[in-house]
């Protein structure tokens, strides 16, 4: 009975907040944003590509963390690399793998006489892929590590993954296909062709393989203001895991923070043409106000245009010795926090031509 009463209270707060904060009818899935409001987190916006979606990113923001996977390959980009540094790095790595011996995990003292490197090849000019194994076993066929490098326009893309022994003979064709798709680009240049955007590049072409991306943006470097966007292929089971199932865990996290929290808004909305759920928390502890906004869209397994999408906006943090209250509190008030959230979510959309 207590849970039922709590649910009624939460729903009542949600309805009141919906009417007071947005002025929209209860059936609407989008939230209007008041134009012309001076918000330091939204001073200038530019189109930004993320996976096969895009949104209007604040120019003053900085990426604090990022991760990309395509076809099971982790993609890591290093910028401003010279051709000489690329050649030296690849040559040193190949020499290391040709010199190093595989070990027997059962008898580490055994001299197996087999070098770690199994294969080395160049799918495209200025690239090198290594297939190797640090161990050898007589009873089972161990998977191989793969490590690849692609260099263009002072940009170095490194790929890492695993490949089964049963597809070892197809390694060249697999990497020929993937590496020929990779094109380097300026990060602010949004491609018009189909493809998957990652740091400094795009894997061109329609999607036939798994794709995953995570980017964290420091909206005001030096202050606790973080936007986190995570995209991956949608699967059928995602439809059974709505955001409401995670409310208990979210509440538990907030309960471990000082102060008292309240729900500003909770319910369904649209994002990038997909059905989604959101829950927006505010936590106040004296002079410190913290906002924790969450959105989850399960996506559509039938199309990569609607990936499983998770968005978090984290404004403010509990005060501590090295973070006084005036620096720990959210850099914007409640109206400003809602404006940031709705502006960025409303701008998240499928990139034209991405599919």
State each model region's role.
Residues 4-18:
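Bacterial N-terminal signal peptides that target proteins for export
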Residues 62, 66-199:
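Long, acidic/polar, low-complexity amphipathic helices and coiled-coil-like
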Residues 61, 159-197, 311-355:
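Surface-exposed amphipathic alpha-helical segments
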Residues 17-26:
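Bacterial N-terminal signal peptides
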Residues 64-112, 158-163, 213-250, 278, ...:
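A short acidic-to-branched-hydrophobic micro-motif
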Residues 165-275:
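Acidic, serine/threonine- and glycine-rich low-complexity intrinsically disordered segments
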Residues 30-32:
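Boundary at the C-terminal end of the N-terminal hydrophobic targeting segment
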């Amino acid at each position: 009975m207590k849970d039922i009463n709590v649910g009624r209270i939460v729903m009542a707060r949600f309805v009141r907040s919906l009417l007071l904060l947005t002025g929209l009818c209860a059936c609407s899935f989008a939230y209007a944003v008041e134009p012309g409001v001076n918000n330091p987190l939204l001073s200038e916006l530019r189109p930004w590509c993320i996976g096969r979606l895009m949104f209007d990113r604040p120019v003053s923001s900085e990426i604090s963390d990022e991760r990309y996977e395509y076809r099971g390959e982790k993609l890591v980009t290093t910028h401003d690399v010279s051709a000489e540094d690329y050649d030296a790095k690849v040559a040193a790595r190949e020499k290391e793998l040709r010199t190093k011996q595989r070990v027997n995990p059962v008898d580490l003292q055994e001299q197996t006489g087999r070098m770690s490197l199994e294969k080395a090849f160049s799918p495209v000019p200025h690239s090198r892929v290594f297939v190797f194994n640090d161990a050898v076993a007589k009873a089972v066929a161990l998977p191989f590590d793969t490590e690849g490098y692609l260099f263009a326009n002072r940009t170095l893309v490194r790929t890492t993954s695993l490949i089964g022994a049963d597809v070892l003979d197809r390694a060249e064709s697999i990497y020929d296909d993937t590496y020929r798709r990779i094109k380097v680009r300026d990060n602010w240049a949004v491609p018009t062709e189909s493809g998957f955007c990652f740091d400094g590049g795009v894997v061109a072409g329609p999607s036939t393989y798994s794709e995953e991306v995570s980017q964290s943006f420091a909206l005001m470097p030096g202050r606790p203001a973080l936007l986190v966007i995570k995209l991956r292929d949608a699967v059928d089971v995602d439809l059974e895991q709505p955001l409401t199932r995670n409310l208990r865990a979210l509440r538990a996290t907030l309960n471990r923070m000082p102060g008292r929290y309240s729900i500003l808004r909770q319910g369904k909305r649209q994002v990038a043409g997909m059905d989604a759920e959101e829950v927006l928390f505010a936590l106040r502890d004296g002079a410190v106000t913290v906002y924790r906004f969450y959105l989850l869209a399960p996506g559509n397994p039938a199309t990569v245009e609607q990936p499983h999408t998770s968005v978090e906006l984290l404004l403010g943090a509990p005060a501590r010795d090295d973070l006084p209250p005036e620096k720990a509190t959210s850099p914007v008030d409640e109206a400003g926090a809602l404006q940031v959230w709705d502006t960025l979510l409303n701008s998240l959309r499928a990139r034209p031509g991405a599919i």
